[in-house]
């Protein structure tokens, strides 16, 4: 199974409601999310399903990716990608989906903890991800995954721009 991790793009510091879940992307964050989506699509990742945190900023990062990958009908929210959740919750969810390639969109420190969990094959390692960065892994469904790439947003933006 191919697992692609995408950390949300730059978000506002505070939401109008004061709730963390309601924080939205900044103008630059929206732009970066679109650039990353184009870069991801240019890589032709074969993604079949996109799971995103229900938080506004993650959803706003996932939506351009879903459009670029022509997967808007395959974009679903899951609480397993909310900040501070146990990475094993989302791993159980993707195993139940029985797909060959999935994109997970979420937050730090959860994404870094999930990435570390996959690379180490067990809890305890965290590999921080920058905003709008993408990691690509191959995982058998148990044990350690193989990290194939860890791409900063600016690299994906260049990939997307060169593909146009």
Predicted feature locations:
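Residues at the C-termini of beta-strands that transition into short coil/loop
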Residues: 7, 79-81, 138, 151-154
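Domain-level recognition of soluble alpha/beta enzyme cores
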Residues: 122-146, 152-158
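A short, gly/pro- and small-residue-rich
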Residues: 70, 114-125
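Generic beta-sheet signal
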Residues: 3, 99-106
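Short active-site-adjacent structural elements
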Residues: 14, 112-114
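Active-site-proximal alpha-helix that buttresses catalytic centers in soluble enzyme cores
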Residues: 2-81, 85-88, 96, 125, ...
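Residue-level signal for well-ordered alpha-helical positions
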Residues: 64-65, 117-118, 140
């Amino acid at each position: 199974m191919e697992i692609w991790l995408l950390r949300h793009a730059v978000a506002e510091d505070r939401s109008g409601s004061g709730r963390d879940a309601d924080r939205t992307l900044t103008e630059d964050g929206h732009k970066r999310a679109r650039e990353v989506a184009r870069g991801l699509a240019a890589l032709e990742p074969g993604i079949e399903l996109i799971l995103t945190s229900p938080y506004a900023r993650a959803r706003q990062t996932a939506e351009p990716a879903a459009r670029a990958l022509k997967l808007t009908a395959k974009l679903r929210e899951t609480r397993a990608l909310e900040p501070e959740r146990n990475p094993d919750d989302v791993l159980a969810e993707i195993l139940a989906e029985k797909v060959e390639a999935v994109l997970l969109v979420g937050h730090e420190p959860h994404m870094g903890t999930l990435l570390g969990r996959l690379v180490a094959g067990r809890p305890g390692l965290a590999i921080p991800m920058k905003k709008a960065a993408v990691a690509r892994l191959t995982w058998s469904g148990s044990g350690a995954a193989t990290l194939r790439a860890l791409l900063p947003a600016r690299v994906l933006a260049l990939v997307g721009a060169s593909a146009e």
